[in-house]
From Swiss-Prot:
Biased composition (Low complexity): 145-161, 240-255, 314-333
Protein name as catalogued: ATPase-like fidgetin
UniProt keyword Zinc present: no
Stretches with biased composition (Polar residues): 213-239, 301-313
Amino acid sequence: MDSDLDRILPIASRALLCEGNRDWAGAYVSYCKVLEEMKKSSAARDRMGLGPLTGAEACSWNGLYDNCLSKASKLRKTILESEMERQNYQLAAKLSKKAPVDLHPLRPVRSQTPAYTPMTTRMMYRQTRGAQSEVNLSTPKQIYSKHSPPSTSTSSIVSSSYGDAPSYLAPSKPNRSPPLKPEDPFASFNSSASAIAAASKSAAASASALSSDTGRSATMNSTTFPTAMKSQSTTKPTLSNSVSSPSIQVSNNQNANNSTPLSFHAPIPPLHVPAVPLTSASHSSSDGKSRKHPSPYKPYLNSSHDTLGSSTRPSSADTAGSPATSPPATADSKTIVSKTISASTTQQTEPLQQTTPSSDFEYAIMNEIISNHEPVYWSDIAGLDDAKNSLKEAVIYPFLRPELFQGLREPVQGMLLFGPPGTGKTMLARAVATEAKATFFSISASSLTSKYLGDSEKLVRALFEVAKRQTCSVIFVDEIDSILSARNDSGNEHESSRRLKTEFLIQWSSLTNAAPDKQTGHSPRVLVLAATNLPWCIDEAARRRFVKRTYIPLPEKETRYKHLSHLLHNQVHCLTEEDLEELVNLTEGYSGSDITALAKDAAMGPLRNLGDALLTTSAEMIPPISLNHFKASLRTIRPSVSQEGIHRYEEWNKQFGSQR
């Protein structure tokens, strides 16, 4: 059960974080992953012969499953209805089932758009009359509606879509007939081509009525439909049976029945991006099949986590100024959207504008942001207490409590982790990405180099510009010596490499003079975290900017014991405490990666002894791992770090390292 929680809760936390940032597509994919992991856990319990859980655990997990399923359905409907509205489609409350047409993915096509663009999903409705319409499922922050009221956030733009727009443009007549309960037209991806065509005419007529009411255009006699659909004159239809898009209830500062029309902004064209094939998560979640769990019970969380777990919920520093995490609920035909938007809703548009890329270089940098990585926690790393405390002091505490770290307590903006290979430097950086609740940029030499003259410097500038727009950012550069190696006058260094180093150092220094945020008054929190196996190869100017230089040594005796115990925790072995103590003494001088390789090789020992009998032996009859298997593997797996290399690291640490 604990392993299920460790695998599911970080994904659920990432879904909440995406909702807080109004990334509906990312939240939808994360919720689908949560449901998939829950189903896998349930199937595993079935195979093990375990009965269904009862009591508080059952109620807690059932609530989690139903909540994720409901949110995923609402997010899917929100994204699809918003795109259909943007493509001038009007959906009826109940579509015909006579001519079902499935939704097919397109193959990736070659596009002239620059390569530095985010991934989106492109779908196509194949209609019976030969008319085709493409629907781009972009992120909601790129979706704009020509019916949106002024000074609204992205969620308000989505909410003021085709179904709700006429309700506040003009007073509608009361509907005497009982209200229709809108059905989800996307519960099954089968729709009628004739119904879609009729809905398109309704959308065109409603757009004509909106234009005449606001005084923007004289008339709309014809509408051009997307992708090879002929223009034809339309008449204004009734909207009593139309399905309204999901709406967000806002503050009612004015009466909803007031007939004064609102002014509208000019429509903003959407951003076109190249098409890519569907991912497994998004395609499996859009197949229209039932979401019921196959087993009679559902895998469970502890009762202390009511919805998605409070232990991994994003901190207040991340969700400050972000919208409510629940997707908009679907409104019926009588729902009336308020004309006024509260001040808090208006202020929520600023983070979206700040994080929107303004160039292809910023697109490339945003692709380096780690969002879907396997979480690593401090408890997963054995030993290295000094390094953990230094990282908490430099990253975790200042990012979570920025009001306490000001003036002389302002955190450092550069930290270097150096030491022999395989000691856990990159693992510490991954733990920082999980624990800090900050935007984590994983940068390598390939992220900042380009074959075009001057593009490398622009990529470096875009990296720091995007990082400064975030509330808290960590720029992790693995193998920093490949980017900021020592400069020399021997002529062996290329001019482009020298310009790249100079630009990186200049942008790094600009973090100190960055202007504070107008709302919070705090300067942007950006930390450059680097790791290297060759600290003596780093340029002196870069070494000065790394205020803290922490040495990551080889694991000590106690650390090796914890590491071996963790590796053998889920394995069938017959090692006693005395055997582990002897094994710890035999692995003197081994790094963390060497010990992991040794344990893997020893685990293969029982299988090697079986030989060809392995093909007919059941898993229960395989012998356990013993000390003799480890001793045999010690002759094969040797230490990767020499004593001369360790001595050199210790000398550099004495001269330049941060001693505690």
